[in-house]
Each structure stands twice: as C-alpha cells, then as structure tokens.
A protein has these predicted regions:
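Iron-sulfur-associated redox domains of electron-transfer enzymes in respiratory
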Residues: 1-130
C-alpha cells in the first residue's frame, strides 16, 4: 500500500500555468483578451491550475514565488522573453529547490492574439509532456 507522499512522487503531476501580464497595461498584450485566454487555458488545457499574476518580476512577485513554488513541479510562465524570465526567476526557483532550466517552461506570448497565444501554449504543453 502506497502512502500519500509516495503516491504523490509516483503520479505524473500536471504543469502549473502562470500568466504574468506586466501590470495588465503592457502594450504587448493589447491584441489579446487576457480573461478569455486564462479561462480557456484553465478549462481546456492539461494544466493543474491557471492564473494571472500582475507582475512576477516586482518585489511582491518575488515574495509570491517564494511562498508559491513547490519542489517536484514544473511551471509554465507565459509573459515576457524566456531569457528574461530565467534571469528574473533564477533565485526564486533555486531557493525552492528547483532548477530554472529544467522546472520553468517560459514562453513569450506578447504581441499575439488570444488564438495565437493559445496555439503556442498548447503546442508547448504537448512538447513538454513528451
């Protein structure tokens, strides 16, 4: 009989999805309906959860990540350039016992319509689950 902690280790965990919107006023998201986007991801994609954060790279975003990130989970962050995300979140991931190069799936969805961004997320999720 498996204990709960052993069961958690053996079952495949879905990726967590975070949409960082740069305060919600970034021109890079003007072609997208952010609420439709996050609700479609939450309801139709194979993610554990999906939510919007206003600005992960600000001080409160760093505090949020410090409390939120859990070991043994992957996180997809949709927002700015992947190189920037890795640089910004490296310490937060390391402090949580995570490897930003392995446990973060950063995607840039700026300047896309809702449908274009959904296509990128779905394709990336498929590739991540292989």
């Amino acid at each position: 009989m498996l204990l709960v902690s052993e069961l958690e280790k053996t079952e495949h965990r879905k990726i967590g999805f975070v949409f960082c919107v740069c305060t919600g006023k970034c021109a890079g998201f003007s072609k997208m309906d952010m609420w439709d986007f996050i609700n479609i991801i939450r309801a139709e994609c194979p993610v554990e959860y999906a939510f919007i954060h206003p600005m992960l790279c600000d001080e409160d975003g760093e505090r949020f990540l410090a409390e939120f990130l859990k070991k043994d989970r992957k996180y997809m962050v949709a927002g700015c350039a992947p190189i920037m995300q890795k640089k910004l979140f490296k310490d937060s991931f390391a402090n949580a016992g995570l490897d930003v190069n392995k446990d973060l799936v950063p995607i840039d969805i700026r300047n896309m319509t809702t449908q274009e961004a959904l296509a990128v997320v779905k394709k990336t999720l498929e590739e991540t689950q292989k």
